[in-house]
């Protein structure tokens, strides 16, 4: 069984943690501020520049929440101090992307261009017409935006065309073999 909930989370320099009543945690750092409401079954404390999570009982559900809470807090601490980024590659003839203000325009081989509204808290850069960098302080939001963009044209297994994560490997298939 994992003991991830028991790890002590080091608070980086320049990061401030506030614990309000009913487990509302606000973490402020150089990149921005994140707030999240956590379960009352988990007690969160700050001691000597460390975040400590303790569970109030030993039920299975509480143990699961303990590890989840610890991981979410670690993500918040990393987000406000360093930030998160996901890189996407676009492969295919005529497939490209461009950022116009708060919209991402994608040409993905459809009869119409795809417009994606960039949500607040996320920044998208088109490094090249075939490379996108999605960055922000909220790990969940950055990952969700990257997944939503990838869903417009997932990589297909025959030629590998589509939108994929930078270090993702596509398992290729062989095409139809000509019959005798």
Curated annotation (Swiss-Prot):
GO terms for molecular function: rRNA binding; structural constituent of ribosome. Transmembrane segments: none annotated. One of its GO terms (biological process) is cytoplasmic translation. PROSITE patterns: RIBOSOMAL_L6_1. One of its GO terms (cellular component) is ribonucleoprotein complex. Keywords: Ribonucleoprotein, Ribosomal protein, RNA-binding, rRNA-binding. Pfam families: Ribosomal_L6 (PF00347). InterPro entries: Ribosomal_uL6-like, Ribosomal_uL6-like_a/b-dom_sf, Ribosomal_uL6_a/b-dom, Ribosomal_uL6_bac-type, Ribosomal_uL6_CS. NCBIfam families: L6_bact. PANTHER family: 60S/50S RIBOSOMAL PROTEIN L6/L9 (PTHR11655), LARGE RIBOSOMAL SUBUNIT PROTEIN UL6M (PTHR11655:SF14). Belongs to the universal ribosomal protein uL6 family. Part of the 50S ribosomal subunit. This is Large ribosomal subunit protein uL6.
């Amino acid at each position: 069984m994992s003991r991830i909930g028991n790890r002590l989370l080091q608070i980086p320099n320049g990061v401030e943690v506030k614990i309000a009543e009913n487990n509302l945690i606000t973490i402020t750092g150089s990149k921005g501020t994140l707030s999240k409401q956590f379960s009352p079954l988990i007690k969160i404390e700050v001691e000597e520049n460390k975040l400590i999570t303790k569970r109030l009982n030993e039920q299975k559900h509480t143990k699961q929440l303990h590890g989840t809470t610890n991981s979410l807090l670690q993500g918040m601490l990393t987000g406000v101090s360093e930030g998160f980024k996901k890189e996407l590659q676009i492969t295919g003839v005529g497939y490209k992307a461009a950022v116009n203000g708060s919209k991402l325009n994608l040409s993905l081989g459809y009869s119409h261009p795809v417009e994606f509204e960039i949500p607040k808290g996320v920044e998208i850069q088109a490094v090249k017409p075939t490379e996108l960098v999605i960055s922000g302080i909220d790990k969940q939001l950055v990952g969700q935006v990257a997944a939503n963009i990838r869903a417009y044209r997932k990589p297909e297994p025959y030629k590998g065309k589509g939108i994929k994560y930078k270090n993702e490997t596509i398992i290729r298939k062989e095409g139809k073999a000509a019959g005798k």
